[in-house]
Amino acid sequence: MFQSSKGSNSSSTSSSRSASISTATPNTVVEDEELLCDPKSELTPPAVTTPLRPVSKSNNTVEDDSKPSFTYDLDVFNLCKEYLNTRNHHGLALIARQKGIPPILRFKVWPILLKSHPFVISPFIQPDSELINESTSSRSNSSSSSTSTGSTTPISTSSGNIKDAAIIDGGASDNDNDGNNDNNDKDNNSNDTSSKEKEEDEQNNEIRQKIKRDLAKYIQRLKYSQSKYTVGETEHEILSILENAIMKFTLKWGKIIKYDSSLTWIALNLAEWFPPIPKTPWVLVGKEYSSSHQSLIVNFLDDYSNYIDNIPDLREYLERLIYHDERISTISFREVYERLVLVLLHCPQPMSRRKKSDNQGQSQRRNQSEAQKDQQSFKVNKTTLPKTGGTIEERVSYFIYCLRKLIPELSQYFHEEQILTKFGCLDDEWLIWWLKFCGTKVWSKYDRGRIWDFMLGWRLKNPKRDFNYYYEKLNYVNRNTLEKLGPDIFWSVGNEEDDISGDKNVDANANEINNSEKTSTGKLVKREGDIKRSSFKDLVNELSNELHISKRVSTDGVITSSSSSSSPTTTKLAPSSSTSSTITPNVSIPFSRVDPHVALIFISLSLLKSKENILVELDQHEIRQFLSRLPSKSYKYNQKRTTKPKRTSYTSNASSTSNSPMGQSPVDRDEDSIFPTNRIVISNDSKDQKHKVNFIDNIIQEAGELWRKWLWSEMVEDN
């Protein structure tokens, strides 16, 4: 039963976690409870409301100072428009994970990406442990008793099971009582059905009240300076759409996960980019707007008006998408929301993960003690988790392990301040919001939007498909434009000699390998039985061998493809051009290799690293409060640092598209000299001396560096 006591704030958020991990509401829970004693009144529109005026092109309600920093390469933007117009989910996914979707196009791109996302096609959500326990208990009770105990969980025994139990218990009675028993069974079934329906209605009403309450908390979170906020007509319609979407999802998936406040926050954060009301531009403002803002909603084009006005005919194109599109995407908010939850809360199926781990050293673990088995399991998880993903408990443990390894100073300070040690109460729930709910509620909408782009664009390469297949799916994209997207952010490099001698020769010709070869090869032969060592090598080789698919083309081929629209002949010429005297780097189509939720761990570490200087100056309470409401990574330069705004803008953009293999300087002049191209970068910054830089692309790039640093350190320890 969903509790409605004073502690319901914490119970509603702890239902989808293990017993040792709690994600209750943040430290403002007491304020929320006091200010929102009657949530219904907060969401009910008044009898007379001020109509919301459409925002015109010249409207300056959103000042330049409050507009987010945004720069985007014009070629990539036009390519994104081309893929959007043709509903090319292959191309849109590529841009989403490599560069990010332009925020003004997310409302049309996200539905397309979600429809084809692997986690939506094959969904799996980690079931709540409470539901599993209650379901098991209800089944055992129904088999041992002829009467129902009135289980209140979404998973309950059917009336048929209860009826069968009653018949079995009454099987020893006289035949003369059969008619009476049948009548009693019918009466009991009728009573059970009506009782169950009434019980379900009560549960649904309780869930709906919790949803209303959590929606009201969002208003209070934004309008904390106002004791009472009047919800307008359009705002009320949006909140009603959100409420119905959350309710339908809960009813559909209630047998797997209970309602949790995170479900409401996911809907609220989605509504910050995707207009809930069809054919309108209204989205929720997000926490970046001041509490004095006149409304909870805003025209999402206003934030990027400078960028829009710098591109001819872009505003007209966007208005056609908003008000007149019937072809590209007409999916409802409820459908987008359901699919988004399936992606954000996805968890790998236990059987598939167990098979992969059991295949490595199964015979060696058989005769070990229980303690050794647990230790060995952790070693194997470190090598399988990056590719397969894991439960939230495993990801939290992995996060803490990587934090200690990659950011030891901050980890030590967290240890001194007792951060990451109190998952049983309200203290460290921020980490669950970061990792399990993918930044919902606690991150800036602009940072979260870019990170969600990355997760929605996550795609694995089909090993049965070759380069020509994917290049055709990308509509033979121009080589220079493809180069701007760079390699997979979480790329890794393996040693080709190790691939040959380590993978092929060890098993078949281990005794014939020359001892004078590389030391690493000798170590691998001597320690062939060491699961930890061989598995890490296998992980690196597997990631590097299938990192991307590519074709090697000659310089002439590059000139041909870049000077005109790419054609199928470009890839056909590739094999014959391999003998040319002048060979350029491969044409690469990057694909994802690391599980998106594991990648999110390194993105979270990168965010912590960027805030390290701030965090070490805060005390325990301030750290938790800060991490529960992380400020945006967009900020304004001081006046003394505005002497080179163009250089900084170029650097910020280049860092998000650089394909430098070793994480060199964001500005890669060599690449520009090899692939001459006009880098036209449009900015959303105002034309005055104030200049802002958005670091979220740098944060994601740094996450890739942390990933390679961790992988390298593990390999060094193995040797």
UniProtKB/Swiss-Prot annotation:
SUPFAM superfamilies: Ypt/Rab-GAP domain of gyp1p (SSF47923). PROSITE patterns: TBC_RABGAP. Keywords: Cytoplasm. Residues 1-22, 135-159, 169-182, 648-660 have a biased composition (Low complexity). Residues 183-198 have a biased composition (Basic and acidic residues). Residues 374-386 have a biased composition (Polar residues). Its main location: cytoplasm. It comes from the Eukaryota. Residues 1-66, 132-205, 351-386, 558-588, 637-674 are annotated as: Disordered. Residues 100-459 form the Rab-GAP TBC domain. SMART domains: TBC (SM00164). InterPro entries: Rab-GAP-TBC_dom (IPR000195), Rab-GAP_TBC_sf (IPR035969). One of its GO terms (cellular component) is cytoplasm. This is Oxidant-induced cell-cycle arrest protein 5. The gene is OCA5.
